[in-house]
């Protein structure tokens, strides 16, 4: 009878590494406290792992975020946590999400939901006690797999099967699911690049393109956040190799002109690229010698600090590059005036874009990663006391001239050189 019931409810019992890793997750994190708090709240209360953490365990990936689903309403979740002295925040109460913090671990606990109204950006929901209905509102089959803490799966749309076969399938009608939240266009691309072992379904690609204008309804922050996740993928190289994926992302981000760069990386370049962040990846994509990067920065909400970082790279490569452009002397100037990050970005940019591995660039990168910014040995106090230069415009001018000479001379300057500048 139990086997029949398990089949009816789409359950899979103790599936090898899955159950072992789920149990390990319960053992190695404080999530057990949350399971106990919810499961013992009432006779029918229940909580399960859901979404990314289950997907990653099935796929033998490291789990970073732990999401949980429960049939308790948010107020009941708060009562259960409070009763067990578990710290929590009502971060998304309207959408049924409570965030719990235990020993520096963060857990998001979300009540089962049904969509009442969607507008392409957000959903108005009502709370539910129906696990199947909660699953049916999710985007892809691989994201609606639930598990109890013993590794027993609830998988109503056969997400495990799709994950193992490398299919990225929407739950239900793709057109309907996309119109509920247009961010799913980018999410589809991210999951395809990361998990697909198949070619794109022509039906899905067609529906994605038909709905592409809906992207304009989304905030720039949500779009950039999803782009960051794509750039973090270990399978990013696939983006430049798969024409349909490349065409799709260019419809959303037309300023990403240099996607093909990821298909031409040797082992050294791939290793170097791993050490870089989203802003550097973005620079590689949008800097092309035109005003393309300016337009992207105008459209999207990039911090002033990161805008400056991209502009330093852009301006550097808009200048004519000579045989001594990447000399230590030239790099020292950038290092002193713009900072370590600017030098590393410029050297990395050149190395990734170069057709062949350049040992000089590699050695310069190693040098500047470990180099501390030097401090000019001559200050205003010395000029005033030793050389009797009064405070004022002349003092500032001489100090700047000395600084320029010191930087141009690889951060060295003699007393005679200082005297020569003062006597000009």
Give the positions of each predicted feature.
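Catalytic cores of the polymerase beta-like nucleotidyltransferase superfamily
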Residues: 1-424
């Amino acid at each position: 009878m139990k086997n029949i019931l398990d089949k009816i409810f789409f359950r899979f019992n103790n599936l090898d590494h899955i159950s072992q890793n789920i149990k390990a997750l319960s053992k190695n994190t404080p999530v057990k406290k949350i399971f106990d708090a919810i499961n013992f709240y009432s006779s029918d209360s229940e909580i399960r792992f859901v979404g990314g953490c289950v997907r990653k365990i099935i796929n033998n990936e490291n789990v970073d975020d732990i999401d949980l689903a429960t049939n308790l309403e948010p107020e009941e979740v708060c009562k259960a946590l409070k009763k067990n002295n578990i710290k929590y925040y009502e971060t998304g109460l309207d959408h049924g999400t409570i965030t719990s913090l235990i020993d520096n671990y963060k857990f998001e606990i979300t009540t089962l939901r049904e969509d009442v109204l969607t507008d392409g950006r957000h959903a108005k929901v009502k709370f539910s006690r129906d696990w199947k209905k909660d699953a049916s509102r999710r985007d892809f089959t691989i994201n609606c797999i639930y598990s109890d803490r013993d590794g027993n799966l609830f998988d109503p749309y056969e997400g495990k099967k799709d994950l193992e076969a490398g299919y990225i399938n929407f739950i239900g009608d793709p057109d309907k699911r996309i119109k509920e939240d247009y961010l799913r266009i980018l999410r589809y691309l991210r999951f395809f690049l990361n998990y697909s072992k198949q070619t794109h379904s022509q039906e899905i690609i067609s529906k994605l393109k038909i709905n592409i204008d809906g992207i304009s309804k989304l905030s720039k922050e949500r779009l950039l956040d999803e782009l960051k996740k794509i750039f973090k993928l270990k399978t990013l190289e696939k983006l430049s190799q798969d024409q349909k994926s490349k065409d799709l992302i260019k419809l959303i981000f037309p300023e990403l002109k240099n996607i093909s760069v990821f298909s031409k990386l040797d082992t050294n370049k791939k290793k170097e690229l791993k050490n870089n962040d989203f802003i550097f990846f973005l620079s590689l994509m949008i800097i092309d010698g035109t005003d393309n990067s300016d337009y992207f920065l105008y459209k999207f909400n990039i911090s002033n600090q990161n805008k400056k970082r991209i502009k330093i790279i852009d301006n550097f490569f808009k200048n004519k590059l000579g045989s001594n452009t990447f000399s230590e002397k030239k790099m020292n100037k950038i290092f002193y005036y713009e900072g370590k990050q600017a030098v590393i970005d410029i050297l990395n940019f050149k190395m990734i874009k170069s057709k062949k591995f350049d040992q000089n660039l590699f050695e310069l990168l190693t040098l500047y990663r470990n180099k501390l910014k030097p401090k000019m040995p001559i200050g205003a106090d010395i000029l005033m006391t030793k050389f009797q230069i009064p405070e004022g415009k002349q003092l500032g001018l001489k100090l700047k001239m000395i600084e320029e000479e010191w930087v141009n001379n690889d951060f060295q300057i003699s007393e005679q050189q200082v005297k020569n500048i003062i006597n000009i």
